[in-house]
Amino acid sequence: MKKSLKALMLGCALGVLPTLAMAQEIAVIVKTTNSNYWQNVRKGAEAAIAGQSKYKMTFEGPASESAVADEVNMVDAAINRKVAGIILAPSDPSALVPAVKQAYDSGIPVVIIDSELSKAAAGDYQSFFSTDNCAAGKMAAQEMISLVGKQGKIAVMSYVPGVGSEIGRVGCFEKYIKSNSSLSIVGPYYSQSQMATALNQTTDVLAANPDLKGIFGANEPTVVGMARAIKQAGKSGQIVAIGFDGNEDEQNFIKDGTLDAIFVQGSYQMGDCLLYTSPSPR
Protein backbone atom coordinates (compact mmCIF):
# COMPACT_ATOMS: atom_id res chain seq x y z
CA MET A 1 0.00 0.00 0.00
CA LYS A 2 1.40 3.38 -0.96
CA LYS A 3 2.37 5.56 1.97
CA SER A 4 1.92 9.30 1.76
CA LEU A 5 2.74 12.52 3.53
CA LYS A 6 0.77 15.55 2.42
CA ALA A 7 1.61 19.15 3.30
CA LEU A 8 -0.97 21.76 4.24
CA MET A 9 0.79 25.08 3.90
CA LEU A 10 -0.38 28.27 5.58
CA GLY A 11 -0.41 31.44 3.52
CA CYS A 12 0.29 34.76 5.22
CA ALA A 13 -0.02 38.44 4.50
CA LEU A 14 2.70 40.83 5.60
CA GLY A 15 1.72 43.52 8.07
CA VAL A 16 3.56 46.50 9.49
CA LEU A 17 4.81 46.48 13.05
CA PRO A 18 4.67 49.76 14.94
CA THR A 19 7.91 51.72 15.33
CA LEU A 20 8.93 51.84 18.98
CA ALA A 21 11.86 53.47 20.74
CA MET A 22 12.86 50.33 22.63
CA ALA A 23 12.42 46.60 22.34
CA GLN A 24 8.83 45.69 23.15
CA GLU A 25 7.39 42.29 23.95
CA ILE A 26 5.23 40.25 21.63
CA ALA A 27 3.65 37.48 23.69
CA VAL A 28 3.05 34.25 21.78
CA ILE A 29 0.67 32.06 23.80
CA VAL A 30 -0.16 28.63 22.39
CA LYS A 31 -2.36 25.72 23.44
CA THR A 32 0.53 23.73 24.88
CA THR A 33 4.30 23.75 24.71
CA ASN A 34 4.42 19.94 24.94
CA SER A 35 3.95 19.39 21.23
CA ASN A 36 6.31 19.17 18.28
CA TYR A 37 3.79 21.19 16.27
CA TRP A 38 3.90 24.18 18.62
CA GLN A 39 7.66 23.95 19.05
CA ASN A 40 7.97 24.27 15.27
CA VAL A 41 5.75 27.36 15.44
CA ARG A 42 8.17 28.69 18.05
CA LYS A 43 11.20 28.03 15.82
CA GLY A 44 9.57 29.86 12.93
CA ALA A 45 8.69 32.84 15.11
CA GLU A 46 12.21 32.98 16.56
CA ALA A 47 13.68 32.95 13.06
CA ALA A 48 11.38 35.79 12.03
CA ILE A 49 12.25 38.00 14.98
CA ALA A 50 16.01 37.41 14.87
CA GLY A 51 18.17 40.22 13.54
CA GLN A 52 15.91 43.10 14.55
CA SER A 53 15.83 45.16 17.71
CA LYS A 54 12.31 46.59 17.86
CA TYR A 55 10.74 43.51 19.40
CA LYS A 56 11.47 40.62 21.67
CA MET A 57 9.30 37.54 21.74
CA THR A 58 8.11 35.47 24.66
CA PHE A 59 6.62 32.04 24.05
CA GLU A 60 4.52 30.08 26.51
CA GLY A 61 1.62 27.69 26.82
CA PRO A 62 0.05 25.30 29.33
CA ALA A 63 1.34 21.81 29.99
CA SER A 64 -1.65 20.40 28.12
CA GLU A 65 -4.38 21.66 25.80
CA SER A 66 -7.02 20.87 28.42
CA ALA A 67 -5.46 23.34 30.91
CA VAL A 68 -7.65 26.17 29.64
CA ALA A 69 -7.57 28.18 32.88
CA ASP A 70 -3.77 28.28 32.71
CA GLU A 71 -3.90 29.74 29.21
CA VAL A 72 -6.41 32.39 30.32
CA ASN A 73 -4.06 33.35 33.16
CA MET A 74 -1.17 33.67 30.69
CA VAL A 75 -3.16 36.11 28.55
CA ASP A 76 -4.15 38.09 31.64
CA ALA A 77 -0.51 38.27 32.71
CA ALA A 78 0.56 39.48 29.26
CA ILE A 79 -2.04 42.24 29.44
CA ASN A 80 -0.75 43.26 32.87
CA ARG A 81 2.78 43.42 31.44
CA LYS A 82 1.46 45.86 28.82
CA VAL A 83 2.90 43.86 25.93
CA ALA A 84 3.01 45.36 22.43
CA GLY A 85 0.93 42.54 20.99
CA ILE A 86 -0.43 39.06 21.67
CA ILE A 87 -0.44 36.10 19.31
CA LEU A 88 -2.87 33.55 20.71
CA ALA A 89 -3.84 29.99 19.84
CA PRO A 90 -7.01 29.61 21.94
CA SER A 91 -7.56 26.20 23.50
CA ASP A 92 -11.24 26.97 24.03
CA PRO A 93 -13.43 29.12 21.73
CA SER A 94 -15.37 30.73 24.59
CA ALA A 95 -13.15 30.72 27.67
CA LEU A 96 -10.54 33.01 26.09
CA VAL A 97 -13.08 35.61 24.90
CA PRO A 98 -13.09 37.79 28.07
CA ALA A 99 -9.29 37.96 28.10
CA VAL A 100 -9.17 38.90 24.42
CA LYS A 101 -11.79 41.59 25.02
CA GLN A 102 -9.70 42.93 27.90
CA ALA A 103 -6.65 43.10 25.64
CA TYR A 104 -8.68 45.01 23.06
CA ASP A 105 -9.94 47.45 25.69
CA SER A 106 -6.33 47.92 26.84
CA GLY A 107 -5.22 48.85 23.32
CA ILE A 108 -3.21 45.64 22.81
CA PRO A 109 -3.58 44.12 19.33
CA VAL A 110 -4.31 40.39 19.22
CA VAL A 111 -3.76 37.92 16.39
CA ILE A 112 -5.62 34.61 16.70
CA ILE A 113 -4.04 31.49 15.21
CA ASP A 114 -4.96 27.84 14.61
CA SER A 115 -8.47 27.87 16.15
CA GLU A 116 -11.20 30.46 15.92
CA LEU A 117 -12.82 32.19 18.87
CA SER A 118 -16.58 32.28 19.23
CA LYS A 119 -18.55 35.03 17.52
CA ALA A 120 -18.73 36.85 20.86
CA ALA A 121 -15.15 38.01 20.24
CA ALA A 122 -15.87 39.45 16.80
CA GLY A 123 -14.15 42.82 16.44
CA ASP A 124 -11.88 42.27 19.45
CA TYR A 125 -8.91 40.86 17.53
CA GLN A 126 -7.07 41.98 14.44
CA SER A 127 -6.42 38.88 12.34
CA PHE A 128 -6.97 35.12 12.20
CA PHE A 129 -4.55 32.65 10.61
CA SER A 130 -4.85 28.89 10.37
CA THR A 131 -4.74 25.86 8.17
CA ASP A 132 -8.04 25.44 6.30
CA ASN A 133 -9.08 22.65 8.64
CA CYS A 134 -12.30 21.87 6.80
CA ALA A 135 -10.38 21.37 3.55
CA ALA A 136 -7.85 19.25 5.44
CA GLY A 137 -10.61 17.10 6.89
CA LYS A 138 -12.08 16.55 3.44
CA MET A 139 -8.67 15.59 2.07
CA ALA A 140 -8.22 13.03 4.84
CA ALA A 141 -11.70 11.64 4.15
CA GLN A 142 -10.95 11.34 0.45
CA GLU A 143 -7.76 9.44 1.26
CA MET A 144 -9.66 7.16 3.64
CA ILE A 145 -12.28 6.30 1.02
CA SER A 146 -9.61 5.69 -1.60
CA LEU A 147 -7.88 3.18 0.71
CA VAL A 148 -10.78 1.37 2.41
CA GLY A 149 -13.55 1.75 -0.16
CA LYS A 150 -17.10 2.93 0.43
CA GLN A 151 -18.39 0.08 2.59
CA GLY A 152 -17.54 -0.96 6.13
CA LYS A 153 -16.65 0.67 9.43
CA ILE A 154 -14.08 3.28 10.40
CA ALA A 155 -13.23 5.04 13.67
CA VAL A 156 -12.43 8.67 14.43
CA MET A 157 -9.98 9.54 17.18
CA SER A 158 -10.26 13.26 17.92
CA TYR A 159 -8.71 15.55 20.53
CA VAL A 160 -10.55 18.40 22.32
CA PRO A 161 -14.27 18.78 21.55
CA GLY A 162 -15.45 22.22 20.49
CA VAL A 163 -12.04 23.66 19.60
CA GLY A 164 -12.20 25.54 16.29
CA SER A 165 -9.59 23.40 14.53
CA GLU A 166 -11.32 20.22 15.71
CA ILE A 167 -14.74 21.37 14.54
CA GLY A 168 -13.46 22.03 11.04
CA ARG A 169 -11.04 19.12 10.75
CA VAL A 170 -13.15 16.34 12.23
CA GLY A 171 -16.52 17.80 11.32
CA CYS A 172 -15.68 18.07 7.63
CA PHE A 173 -14.01 14.64 7.65
CA GLU A 174 -17.20 13.07 8.96
CA LYS A 175 -19.45 15.09 6.67
CA TYR A 176 -17.49 14.07 3.58
CA ILE A 177 -17.48 10.40 4.61
CA LYS A 178 -21.25 10.42 5.17
CA SER A 179 -21.96 12.25 1.91
CA ASN A 180 -19.66 10.20 -0.31
CA SER A 181 -19.73 6.67 1.06
CA SER A 182 -21.72 4.14 3.06
CA LEU A 183 -19.00 3.84 5.69
CA SER A 184 -20.25 3.80 9.27
CA ILE A 185 -18.29 5.86 11.81
CA VAL A 186 -17.38 4.76 15.33
CA GLY A 187 -16.72 7.75 17.55
CA PRO A 188 -15.38 10.38 17.64
CA TYR A 189 -13.38 9.72 20.78
CA TYR A 190 -11.66 12.63 22.52
CA SER A 191 -8.13 12.20 23.84
CA GLN A 192 -7.87 15.74 25.25
CA SER A 193 -4.63 15.77 23.23
CA GLN A 194 -3.12 13.22 25.62
CA MET A 195 -1.11 10.47 23.94
CA ALA A 196 -1.73 7.93 26.71
CA THR A 197 -5.48 8.57 26.58
CA ALA A 198 -5.50 8.10 22.81
CA LEU A 199 -3.55 4.85 23.18
CA ASN A 200 -6.05 3.45 25.69
CA GLN A 201 -9.06 4.62 23.69
CA THR A 202 -7.72 3.11 20.48
CA THR A 203 -6.91 -0.16 22.22
CA ASP A 204 -10.53 -0.36 23.39
CA VAL A 205 -11.90 0.58 19.96
CA LEU A 206 -9.83 -2.07 18.20
CA ALA A 207 -10.91 -4.74 20.69
CA ALA A 208 -14.59 -3.81 20.42
CA ASN A 209 -14.57 -3.53 16.63
CA PRO A 210 -12.60 -6.42 15.09
CA ASP A 211 -14.19 -5.60 11.71
CA LEU A 212 -12.80 -2.05 11.67
CA LYS A 213 -11.37 -1.17 8.25
CA GLY A 214 -9.87 2.25 8.94
CA ILE A 215 -9.07 4.78 11.64
CA PHE A 216 -8.40 8.53 11.54
CA GLY A 217 -6.38 10.42 14.16
CA ALA A 218 -6.92 14.17 14.17
CA ASN A 219 -3.84 15.68 15.84
CA GLU A 220 -0.26 14.87 16.81
CA PRO A 221 -0.56 13.34 20.31
CA THR A 222 -3.75 11.53 19.33
CA VAL A 223 -2.13 10.02 16.25
CA VAL A 224 0.95 8.87 18.15
CA GLY A 225 -1.19 7.15 20.79
CA MET A 226 -3.43 5.67 18.10
CA ALA A 227 -0.49 4.30 16.13
CA ARG A 228 1.13 2.79 19.21
CA ALA A 229 -2.12 1.00 20.02
CA ILE A 230 -2.38 -0.34 16.47
CA LYS A 231 1.18 -1.62 16.63
CA GLN A 232 0.73 -3.17 20.08
CA ALA A 233 -2.40 -4.94 18.85
CA GLY A 234 -0.43 -6.45 15.97
CA LYS A 235 -2.61 -4.72 13.40
CA SER A 236 0.00 -2.65 11.56
CA GLY A 237 -0.74 -2.99 7.87
CA GLN A 238 -4.06 -4.74 8.58
CA ILE A 239 -6.08 -1.59 9.20
CA VAL A 240 -5.87 1.66 7.25
CA ALA A 241 -4.62 4.40 9.57
CA ILE A 242 -4.51 8.07 8.61
CA GLY A 243 -3.07 10.81 10.81
CA PHE A 244 -2.63 14.55 11.10
CA ASP A 245 0.58 16.51 11.78
CA GLY A 246 3.99 14.96 11.23
CA ASN A 247 6.44 14.67 14.10
CA GLU A 248 9.27 12.14 14.08
CA ASP A 249 7.14 9.43 15.69
CA GLU A 250 4.48 9.77 13.00
CA GLN A 251 7.09 9.69 10.25
CA ASN A 252 8.50 6.48 11.71
CA PHE A 253 5.02 4.97 11.81
CA ILE A 254 4.70 5.79 8.12
CA LYS A 255 8.00 4.04 7.44
CA ASP A 256 7.09 0.86 9.34
CA GLY A 257 3.63 0.62 7.80
CA THR A 258 1.54 1.41 10.88
CA LEU A 259 0.28 4.65 9.34
CA ASP A 260 -0.79 4.85 5.71
CA ALA A 261 -0.89 8.64 5.36
CA ILE A 262 -0.35 11.79 7.40
CA PHE A 263 -1.45 15.32 6.60
CA VAL A 264 1.16 17.87 7.65
CA GLN A 265 0.66 21.54 8.46
CA GLY A 266 3.28 24.22 7.84
CA SER A 267 3.84 24.98 11.52
CA TYR A 268 7.29 26.54 11.04
CA GLN A 269 5.92 28.78 8.28
CA MET A 270 3.04 29.79 10.55
CA GLY A 271 5.48 31.00 13.19
CA ASP A 272 7.63 32.73 10.59
CA CYS A 273 4.62 34.65 9.28
CA LEU A 274 3.10 35.63 12.58
CA LEU A 275 5.74 38.07 13.75
CA TYR A 276 5.03 40.08 10.60
CA THR A 277 1.28 40.09 11.06
CA SER A 278 1.11 41.65 14.52
CA PRO A 279 -0.73 44.87 13.71
CA SER A 280 -0.09 48.37 14.92
CA PRO A 281 -1.83 49.39 18.14
CA ARG A 282 -5.13 51.17 17.76
Model-derived segments and spans:
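Flexible loop/hinge segments that line or gate small-molecule binding clefts
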Residues: P93-A135, S146, K153, Y159, ...
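Hydrophobic alpha-helical
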Residues: I79, L88-D105, F173, G187, ...
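Sec/Tat signal peptide C-region and signal peptidase I cleavage site
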Residues: L17-A23
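Conserved small/polar residues in nucleotide/adenosyl-binding loops
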Residues: Y276-R282
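Hinge/beta->alpha junction and helix N-cap segments in small-molecule ligand-binding domains
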Residues: I29-R42, F59-E71, D92, S115, ...
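Bacterial N-terminal signal peptides that target proteins for export
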Residues: M1-M9
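Short, polar/charged alpha-helical segment
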Residues: W38-Y55
